[in-house]
């Protein structure tokens, strides 16, 4: 399929122009079916060598939120505990083990063999890409998102990923946003401030 057709203005608004970072959510649950549908969109986003290093934990239960709570900064705790879903966006630093399946037309695994430190940058970069896809896919499905980094990564890793090569990156609260929790819309940089032609 060639990407030849632009999305209409309403779709672009939903994804970008009128979408907001949410700080409060309606008391409406998000089903596991919707979260699975969300991942089924996210997985198609491009990553280097189709490495797909992101790993997602959808924290929806009271037990899961209790496990997450000690890692949250004071300013993020209340809204995170109240959100229907908090996604831990993480990455697997041993992602290369799956490359024979994910990238079969080249020996991509050999590119990343060796000390784990040599894979950290790629895992972080491509996992971050997948986290961004998650936010846009959520918006496309009618969900609202509140991404944040105000938490203790080491505590999250100990609570959710102990004994594994998986490292947390950032959190995303998901649900159906409550406009009462929005801050006034902040400005963005103009093209000339952020970009140039060469």
UniProtKB/Swiss-Prot annotation:
InterPro entries: Nitroreductase, Nitroreductase-like, Nitroreductase_HadB/RutE, RutE-like. Keywords: Flavoprotein, FMN, NAD, NADP, Oxidoreductase. GO terms for molecular function: oxidoreductase activity. Its cofactor is FMN. Its EC number is 1.-.-.-. Pfam families: Nitroreductase. Belongs to the nitroreductase family. HadB/RutE subfamily. NCBIfam families: PRK05365.1. PANTHER family: MALONIC SEMIALDEHYDE REDUCTASE RUTE-RELATED (PTHR43543:SF1). This is Putative NADH dehydrogenase/NAD(P)H nitroreductase XAC0554. The lineage of its organism: Bacteria, Pseudomonadati, Pseudomonadota, Gammaproteobacteria, Lysobacterales.
